[in-house]
Amino acid sequence: MSEPKNSLSASRIKTLQSCSWMYYAKYVIGIPDKSNDGANRGTICHLIFEVLGEPRRKKIYDKIIKKQDVFSVKSVEKLIFKHAKRLGVNDDDNIELIKKMTLNGLMYDFFGLSAGKPALAVSEQDFDIVVNDGKFKYKIKGFIDKLFLYKKQKFALIRDFKTSRETFKGKEVKDNLQDYMYSLAVKHLFPEYSDRASEFLFLKFELDDSKNSGIIRMAPITDDDLEGFEHQLTAIQEYLDNFSEEDAYSNFASKQPFPKDKTFSGPLQCGFAKYPGQLKIDGTPMWACSCKWAFDYFSTVDENGKQLKSYFNESDIPEGQKYEKRSYKGCPAHQKKS
């Protein structure tokens, strides 16, 4: 039996479910991905959580909590500014948001002691799991922001930090793809921890038990439900390992109905701009999906011409790398018919 080819992640599957062309453009063509301030702020927050999750840095953590300011430790301040400058989010507004969200995450049971002392606490627990046993066939890959393992209770607490401006909506609240993916990964990595639960912390919100809390706790997923998820993964794996340009035309976001559950899905994902650079009434650019319009880009390639990584700007390509200039024609659903 052949091995699964593509690594499945929650974000990859969600992209496929959201829009078949977006999946094709990002994962098959391999166009460069446009970052944004929100994602870049999140990258920095996650970095600080990983750094301060090390037991040997507990004194640094304690000082920050005592002062209620992540900049009370100069090395942390320098680290934040270093990466904020690199990612283009070093203006005052972005820095304040980074400070606030980082402190919020540090203040909330950062070492997982509310359920007792964990036998193991891991920051950025990665997983790369291949199953090909005749019944199931899939390859899942990703990482868990924080994982706490409580040996006596045989309990695994899975924690994910979110820096988005909204909490989950619609089915994501109770039937969450990340929750299933992480729970399955922990079952494979630590099978002796039979009780597993996920919590998502939205750092722009208060992390308390109020009505508008940024804490979303998921009900534990049963082994039967995880087995059902494995059947789904097997079907998705087969589909994506044979994904073609014809499949890319099968489920355009623009052809889907508008969402009724307040989720960011369907045509909303395309954006309402009718041409590149269209401005809103206030003079700011209208948002549009990064796959919507045509553009040129650059791809580094290996000796066989296989694409390694893509870039918007030629100046960003590492020195000495072989590369090609390529053209992306834009999303067919938004191209003007001649």
Feature locations, PLM:
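RecB-family 4Fe-4S metal-dependent nuclease core
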Residues: 1-338
